[in-house]
């Protein structure tokens, strides 16, 4: 498939961002979403959840654990640390997808899709992103620039429908768009 510009993919297994998923055209970041059961919390003086949380999102306040969702990175480090099982995780690893990131002299933080996806959704999303890129970007235009020009909402709507895959042969047959 001839694309308008290079297309870099990054895959990281956790939110530490070692592979810089938000700074590549398509980035995958694994998450273990913790589930807090306040009924199981006994408000330990030395809370193992609070002690283990690398982002300091967990704090014991008035004898009960509180997890600040705006700070929590959903890394899953806290899962299994409480001897009373106050924190568990969703049954499977979920993934945050970033699209349109670049780094270097023209850096752009990738746009995070609005929802987590499962492992089975990743490969079709990569294919759909590449098809959208081919159909919407001008020659030598990076994916992030095309997203900024066309709109992240339009990209996301296309990625979560099957329209691009239904038109795959048509899109692949087209030449790369030239600047008007």
Which role does the model predict for each range below?
Residues 89-90, 102, 111-116, 143-158, ...:
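Accessory RNA-recognition modules of RNA-modification enzymes
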Residues 1-7, 61, 135-149, 165-173, ...:
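Flexible, glycine/charged-enriched surface loops at secondary-structure junctions
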């Amino acid at each position: 498939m001839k694309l308008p510009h290079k297309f870099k993919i990054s895959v990281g297994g956790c939110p530490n961002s070692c592979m810089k998923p938000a700074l590549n055209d398509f980035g995958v970041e694994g998450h273990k979403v913790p589930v807090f059961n306040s009924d199981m919390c006994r408000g330990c003086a030395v809370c193992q959840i609070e002690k283990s949380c690398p982002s300091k999102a967990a704090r014991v306040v008035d004898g009960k654990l509180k997890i600040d969702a705006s700070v929590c990175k959903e890394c899953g480090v806290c899962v299994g640390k409480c001897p009373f099982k106050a924190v568990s995780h969703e049954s499977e690893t979920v993934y945050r997808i970033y699209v349109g990131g670049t780094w270097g002299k023209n850096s752009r933080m990738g746009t995070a899709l609005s929802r987590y996806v499962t492992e089975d959704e990743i490969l079709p999303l990569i294919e759909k992103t590449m098809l959208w890129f081919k159909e919407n970007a001008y020659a030598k235009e990076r994916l992030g620039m095309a997203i900024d020009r066309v709109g992240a909402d339009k990209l996301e709507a296309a990625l979560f429908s099957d329209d691009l895959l239904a038109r795959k042969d048509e899109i692949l047959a087209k030449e790369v768009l030239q600047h008007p």
